A protein has these predicted regions:
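Surface-exposed beta-strand edges and their flanking turn/coil or helix-capping segments
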Residues: 6, 41-43, 106
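Predominant activation on well-ordered alpha-helical scaffold segments within soluble catalytic domains
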Residues: 10-14, 48-55, 68, 72
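Generic structural motif recognizing short loop/turn segments at the entrances and edges of beta-strands
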Residues: 24-26, 39-41, 88, 97-100
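Gly/Ser-rich catalytic serine loop of serine hydrolases
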Residues: 33-45, 79
Length: 124
């Protein structure tokens, strides 16, 4: 993937480890088919990959709710992190303690089309 996405994976990984006072080094090779800077959640996917990698390094089980909260805190884009983790169309609302994620139902009569612009636009 793009080096910016790699930086997001690394930053989220290091941030997740640092919460437990840990550090790590090494090389990670990754790839993604999500177009970068096109509004499809590549940044959220990169952040979540870093968080999941930190869990794996520590030997901890996946915790989707905790991963979502960490991604929301790290990036602030719950609208992309929620569908990335939980699938489907999701609404994300700020909560007193943690963001509230709600699944939204879609009619089968609704179709989607997407055309990626030739130039990327950062949403961070």
């Amino acid at each position: 993937t793009d080096s910016v996405e790699n930086d997001l994976v690394t930053a989220a990984f290091m941030e997740a480890l640092s919460k437990d006072g840990l550090e790590a080094g090494g090389t990670v090779h990754l790839s993604s088919t999500i177009p970068v800077a096109r509004g499809l959640g590549s940044s959220a996917a990169a952040v979540l990959a870093g968080i999941d990698l930190a869990l794996a390094v520590r030997g901890l089980p996946e915790d989707r709710d905790a991963a979502f909260c960490a991604a929301y805190e790290h990036e602030g884009h719950g609208d992309n992190a929620a569908p990335c983790l939980f699938g489907g169309l999701r609404a994300v609302l700020p909560g007193a303690i943690r963001p509230l994620v709600t699944k939204l139902e879609l009619s089968d009569m609704i179709g989607f089309a997407y055309a990626a612009p030739p130039a990327g636009i950062s949403t961070i």
